[in-house]
């Protein structure tokens, strides 16, 4: 695949997810992303079973290079500033004020690179009454109103992956790409501020729009009821999911697949608005029917009747599906020290060519000597 950002260099002073995720998206598009880490321990996400190559770290740090620098030490700070001088983008996800303490504030970096795109990711924002609060994923989900859309109402507990972290990283990468596009026309850099609160509020746009427009406060079942989305356990213990939306043909197809015409004529379910109002009853009616056949059998019946559906896979099944295998979503590469690395490729395909090339996440300071040599050569050429 074409490496769209191959001529851009990104210096990432990021930890955990938001900063590294932003860097990963740019690296997936071909940028030379150099991860600057603390000597000895590196990104805190590295730590795992006595080692420094955790699955969490691997998730967000492929296609990058690593250099270990203690920017509180004058020698390493100079290397860091020399590195930033070669960069197009700088990413950090510290609390406000911390970057300045380690020589990575915007003012310091503008002195060595005036055209830099400087991206600062925070939890609650660069200013305001909550600016100094520590924030992790669940806090941002909660503050943005999103957590309530995922929380089981009968037994409140946090479920699901780190959506706020991942979403913030995606928005940061999008903003960076926009700033780089502008810079190709103006030659000027930008400061990009993005908080997890703002990112998740935008991601939660549908919920806010419903409230602004009709005064409705959406809950975890609001969208599934209106969209007529369902998931059921089959006779083999595996799950299936389907989404009917509003076209009548999908409901009609479901009734045929079920083989229970009485469900289609039941006044509680015969019309879409009735199905929305009585979704719990409809679930109760369908659940025992789905337990009569295996998931494979139900997929065949729903497919024959053109009902939008899929097996509800676990992660050990999803990429073995024929369509996923056809698309080549799973890719593998070898790290000289850590061995085989398997991941999910970037979702982009430019000019019909998906990107199946991937570099394993670097070990701590894996490219330190290489990067220092590059900087020394650059300095020598400059005289």
Task: List PLM regions with ranges.
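Terminal low-complexity tails and localization/encapsulation signals of metabolic enzymes
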Residues: 1-8, 233, 317-383
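N-terminal helix-loop segment corresponding to the beta1-alpha1 unit
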Residues: 1-175, 179-185, 363, 367-383
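Glycine-rich beta-alpha junction loops
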Residues: 40, 124-125, 196-201, 236-238, ...
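Conserved Rossmann-fold dehydrogenase catalytic segment
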Residues: 126, 153-163, 184-198, 219-224, ...
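Mid-domain beta-loop-alpha active-site segment that forms a flexible
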Residues: 162-177, 196-204, 246, 250
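Oxidoreductase and adenylate-handling cofactor-binding alpha/beta cores
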Residues: 169-189, 202, 206-212, 255-260
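Aromatic-enriched alpha-helical interface/lid elements that frame and gate functional surfaces
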Residues: 228-305, 309
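Conserved PLP cofactor-binding pocket of PLP-dependent enzymes
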Residues: 303-324
């Amino acid at each position: 695949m074409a490496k769209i950002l191959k001529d851009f260099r990104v210096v990432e002073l990021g930890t955990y997810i938001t900063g590294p995720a932003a860097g990963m998206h740019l690296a997936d598009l071909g940028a030379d992303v150099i991860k600057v880490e603390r000597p000895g321990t590196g990104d805190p996400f590295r730590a795992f079973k006595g080692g420094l190559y955790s699955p969490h770290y691997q998730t967000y740090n492929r296609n990058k290079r690593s250099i270990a620098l203690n920017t509180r030490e004058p020698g390493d700070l100079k290397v860091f500033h020399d590195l930033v001088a070669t960069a197009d983008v700088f990413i950090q996800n510290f609390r406000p004020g911390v970057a300045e303490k380690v020589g990575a504030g915007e003012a310091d970096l503008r002195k060595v690179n005036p055209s830099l795109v400087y991206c600062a990711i925070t939890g609650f924002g660069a200013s305001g009454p909550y600016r100094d609060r520590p924030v992790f994923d669940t806090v941002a989900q909660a503050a943005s109103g999103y957590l309530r859309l995922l929380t089981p109402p009968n037994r409140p507990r946090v479920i699901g992956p780190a959506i706020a972290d991942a979403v913030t990283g995606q928005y940061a990468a999008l903003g960076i790409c926009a700033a780089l596009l502008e810079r190709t026309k103006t030659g000027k850099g930008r400061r990009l501020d993005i908080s997890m609160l703002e990112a998740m509020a935008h991601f939660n746009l549908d919920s806010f729009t419903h409230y602004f427009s009709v005064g409705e406060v959406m809950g975890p079942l609001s969208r599934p009821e209106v969209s007529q989305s369902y998931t059921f356990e089959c006779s083999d213990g595996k799950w299936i999911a389907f989404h009917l939306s509003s076209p009548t043909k999908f409901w009609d197809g479901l009734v045929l697949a079920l083989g229970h015409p009485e469900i289609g004529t039941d006044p509680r379910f015969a019309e879409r608005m009735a199905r929305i109002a009585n979704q719990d009853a409809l679930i109760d009616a369908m659940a025992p029917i789905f337990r009569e056949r295996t998931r494979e059998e139900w997929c065949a019946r729903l497919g024959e009747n053109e009902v939008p559906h899929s097996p509800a896979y676990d992660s050990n099944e999803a990429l073995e599906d024929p369509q996923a295998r056809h698309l080549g979503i799973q890719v593998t590469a070898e790290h000289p020290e850590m061995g085989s690395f398997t991941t999910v490729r970037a979702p982009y395909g430019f000019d019909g060519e998906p990107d199946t090339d991937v570099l394993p996440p670097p070990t701590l300071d894996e490219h330190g000597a290489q990067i220092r040599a590059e900087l020394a050569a650059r300095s020598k050429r400059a005289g």
